Amino acid sequence: MIDLYTWPTPNGRKVSIALEEMGLAYRCHAVDLQAQDQFHPDFLAISPNNKIPAIVDQKTGQSLMESGAILIYLADTCGQFWGDDRYTTLQWLMWQMGGLGPMLGQVHYFKKYNAGKSVYAEERFFNEALRLYKILDQRLAETEYLSGSYSIADMAVWPWVSRFEWQGVNLKDFLNVQRWYEAIAARPAVQKGYDQPMYMNDIPKV
């Protein structure tokens, strides 16, 4: 049994989607970010960086923070979802962790939550988001999924793309991304994992 500590954010949804896809037994514990549950000492003992998601694998005693590390652990645990090549999968997972996620997070911060406070920041991060979407679209013109077959790299990237409306991005401008996004959105495990630890909103449609 795996205990998952999470909230309905892109990073949180990565792991709940992975657990559903892998069919691993888990219990979901809501960490309410608005109530600042992430600063509770019990949670900090698992995730010292006070960020969700985090897991505790009751079978092995392993606790982990950082969504990318958790995805790698889960893929190794179940022996699935490494795509056609482990290192290609890791490459795109790191691209998400180091580039796509942080940059789209800045778009959310400036464009959605603080619109008008810094035109420079809004434009800078929006343009970077478009650059990253172009890279993603080019990759998905070459292959069905990021690593050939469906993998943890797709599970990491997809929840961030699912907030395209927050980013002001039109997926119809990126037809390969749109095809990939809609295919993943139709997966039953993704639909179930998206609503953990609770329903927040429908999966956005293009």
Residue ranges and their predicted role:
Residues 1-130, 137:
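GST-like domain detector, emphasizing the conserved glutathione-binding G-site
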